[in-house]
Swiss-Prot record:
The lineage of its organism: Bacteria, Bacillati, Bacillota, Bacilli, Bacillales. It comes from Macrococcus caseolyticus (strain JCSC5402) (Macrococcoides caseolyticum). An aminoacyl-tRNA editing enzyme that deacylates mischarged D-aminoacyl-tRNAs. Also deacylates mischarged glycyl-tRNA(Ala), protecting cells against glycine mischarging by AlaRS. Acts via tRNA-based rather than protein-based catalysis; rejects L-amino acids rather than detecting D-amino acids in the active site. By recycling D-aminoacyl-tRNA to D-amino acids and free tRNA molecules, this enzyme counteracts the toxicity associated with the formation of D-aminoacyl-tRNA entities in vivo and helps enforce protein L-homochirality. It comes from the Bacteria. Its EC number is 3.1.1.96. This is D-aminoacyl-tRNA deacylase. A motif (Gly-cisPro motif, important for rejection of L-amino acids) lies at residues 136-137. Disulfide bonds: none annotated. One of its GO terms (cellular component) is cytoplasm. Keywords: Cytoplasm, Hydrolase, RNA-binding, tRNA-binding. GO terms for molecular function: D-tyrosyl-tRNA(Tyr) deacylase activity; Gly-tRNA(Ala) deacylase activity; Ser(Gly)-tRNA(Ala) hydrolase activity; tRNA binding. Homodimer. It catalyses: glycyl-tRNA(Ala) + H2O = tRNA(Ala) + glycine + H(+); a D-aminoacyl-tRNA + H2O = a tRNA + a D-alpha-amino acid + H(+).
Amino acid sequence: MRVLVQRVKEASVKSGDYYGSVQKGLLLLVGVHELSTESDADALADKIVKSRIFEDDAGKMNLSVQDIAGEILSISQFTLYADVKKGNRPSFTKAMQPQKAEQIYHYFNTQLKNKGLKVVQGCFGEMMDIALINEGPVTIMYESKDGKLV
């Protein structure tokens, strides 16, 4: 399972009539591998929530999203598992099938919410318009396999 994390001043998602937004916090692009499990979601949720990627008063990255009472916009993103080795069209065969991936995606978001964070979700499997203002920028890729960070 992969999660691309971006530190944001604000971010929003729109899909049809649906609109969701967050203020200062994180934008998460969440990719679920064909072998991902709830253990991977647990490991990533725990690490991301505790990661000190926000600046303290001295300008050092010393604060987590929990420390700043930040918000999270979580977007499903199967294209994080694109294979571009052959041809010109990416293959997405390493991404989990949508029905199972959606379950793990929602489970991951529930784990974030259980840690006391405001979590806004995108629309799984739908075309979305994502807007954000990066802060930094700070962009970090997190990955878990077999319930452990890699």
